[in-house]
Amino acid sequence: MTAPSTPKPQRKKPKTATTAKPVVPRKEATLHPRNRHTGRYDFQALIKTTPELAQFVIINPYGKESIDFASPDAVRVFNRALLKSFYGIQHWDIPADYLCPPVPGRADYVHFLADLLASVNDGKIPRGSIVKVLDIGMGANCVYPLIGYMEYRWNFLGSEVDPIAVAAAKAIVQSNDLSKVIQLRQQTNPKQILLSLLEPGERFDLTMCNPPFHASMDEATKGSERKWRALGKADPKRKLPVLNFGGQSAELWCEGGEARFVTQLIAESAHFAHKVLWFSTLVSKASNLPAIETALKKAGVLESQVVEMSQGQKQSRFVAWTFQTKNEQQIWRQRWVRD
């Protein structure tokens, strides 16, 4: 994706606006307490719901049941079993070579976003179809909308530039009879993220995004090689097969990498300052945070924060920002109140 510069819309700050909070990572967090995936997996229970998983179960070097996470087929079937067992998703599959994200980490992002909404709603998580979420670049897997709906009954709009990914996600949504609560939309301009996508009158309580994190295909390939070698070190007997962690080019890299993509997203978000309560995006590289902080200030963001997450040995985080004052946030939350 080529990320052109985006003109900042002319907008006056409200008199009650406060200076944007600097983006400073919080202390490391553990798996979210509402995450269903704490502790070890009961593989025999998973096999009962998804029998095809049995062929991929192995005994790891520690004598425990696991799967070969270096096998795309094993990871895909494992994800299918998790989504079926924990979330009631009866039908889930993706085309070969498309990104197959780890479900626990994706669930963490959803739960922490729920906490973000609760923070402006007297600690109560708003639930149901009144909450609208935009998943930017949902991919073929459609995992965020599936988890978000099953956990909180939120309604989703998923956007994607790849027509094959849109078709795959549509098949998942339709086969699980979720078309009324999960809508899909193709972004026809690959050089834009929010612009040319949203329609007049649309409002969202949240946006979420798993951005491309590499700046080139070469960088993405080297990243895959590092993952393979890390897995090889965990099992000295492992032979390094053909690189294939899954992921199409639009999922893995874009011109300028993660920093360029996120800063463009921030710039474009200013055009929808009062159409969205909280914008957010994952940030895989902590080294990109200073550039992101600069972009937030330039865009006129009034409040921002970094939420650190931890899944096993992996550390991740997301950045969230809003253009709305505290008073405007309180007005916004009134739409969540049901009669």
Swiss-Prot record:
Its EC number is 2.1.1.181. SUPFAM superfamilies: S-adenosyl-L-methionine-dependent methyltransferases (SSF53335). It is found in: Cytoplasm. Residues 1-26 are annotated as: Disordered. Keywords: Cytoplasm, Methyltransferase, rRNA processing, S-adenosyl-L-methionine, Transferase. Gene3D superfamilies: Vaccinia Virus protein VP39. It catalyses: adenosine(1618) in 23S rRNA + S-adenosyl-L-methionine = N(6)-methyladenosine(1618) in 23S rRNA + S-adenosyl-L-homocysteine + H(+). One of its GO terms (biological process) is rRNA base methylation. GO terms for molecular function: 23S rRNA (adenine(1618)-N(6))-methyltransferase activity. Pfam families: Methyltransf_10. InterPro entries: METTL16/RlmF, rRNA_lsu_MeTfrase_F, SAM-dependent_MTases_sf. Its main location: cytoplasm. One of its GO terms (cellular component) is cytoplasm. HAMAP family: 23SrRNA_methyltr_F. PANTHER family: RNA N6-ADENOSINE-METHYLTRANSFERASE METTL16, SAM-DEPENDENT METHYLTRANSFERASE. NCBIfam families: PRK11727.1 (NF008725). Specifically methylates the adenine in position 1618 of 23S rRNA. Belongs to the methyltransferase superfamily. METTL16/RlmF family. This is Ribosomal RNA large subunit methyltransferase F. It comes from Pseudomonas fluorescens (strain SBW25). The gene is rlmF.
